[in-house]
Amino acid sequence: MGNFHATTIFAIHHNGKCAMAGDGQVTFGNAVVMKHTARKVRKLFQGKVLAGFAGSVADAFTLFEMFEGKLEEYNGNLQRAAVEMAKQWRGDKMLRQLEAMLIVMDETTLLLVSGTGEVIEPDDGILAIGSGGHYALAAGRALKRHASEHLTAKEIAKASLEIAGDICVYTNHNIIVEEL
């Protein structure tokens, strides 16, 4: 059997608020949509942290559990938990095989965490990953730049995913948005 994957996750810090959106599509291989309503964005650490994943579903659940453990270990310090998780992920032969990426955020910090050991904080407070990530990122940057006084973080996140869903065949319009 092949891998279950493909999604789009978008996150933004905007006007003192933060929001993360993800679509619900799970694709089996490159040809079959297996699920339309997957929940790929979650609140962690007593609702103070948002996390979203793109990639293999089973791998992502493993990473969610691992990240949540690091958050507990480091008392909710997002940056420290992300760095320690990335070190463990990169340094462990079995974990290196996991095929997923995470975006994690709290009210002040937004980070991309990958299995290559990268922990990246964007300059503009916007991140997007997954098959429709480039489309969502472009849409989100345009919306923030040209309509920021009229839109909330949640509205920008949702609109960015809707635009990605119009373009990317691996992104659907069953959008879940979480905010802090």
Swiss-Prot record:
Enzyme Commission number, as recorded: 3.4.25.2
Q: Where is the active site?
A: 7
CDD domains per UniProt: protease_HslV
Q: Which Gene Ontology BP terms does the record give? A: proteolysis involved in protein catabolic process
Q: Which Pfam families match?
A: Proteasome
Give the UniProt keywords, A-Z: Allosteric enzyme, Cytoplasm, Hydrolase, Metal-binding, Protease, Sodium, Threonine protease
Recount the known activity regulation. Allosterically activated by HslU binding.
| Cell compartment(s), UniProt | Cytoplasm
Query: Mind listing the GO molecular function terms for this protein?
Result: metal ion binding; threonine-type endopeptidase activity
**What does it catalyze?**
ATP-dependent cleavage of peptide bonds with broad specificity
Ligand binding (Na(+)): 165, 168, 171
- The highest taxon in the source lineage is Bacteria
GO terms under cellular component: HslUV protease complex; proteasome core complex
Family designation: Belongs to the peptidase T1B family. HslV subfamily.
PANTHER family per UniProt: ATP-DEPENDENT PROTEASE SUBUNIT HSLV (PTHR32194:SF0), METALLOPROTEASE TLDD (PTHR32194)
Describe the function of this protein. Protease subunit of a proteasome-like degradation complex believed to be a general protein degrading machinery.
Could you describe the subunit structure of this protein? A double ring-shaped homohexamer of HslV is capped on each side by a ring-shaped HslU homohexamer. The assembly of the HslU/HslV complex is dependent on binding of ATP.
| Full protein name | ATP-dependent protease subunit HslV
Q: What is the gene called?
A: hslV
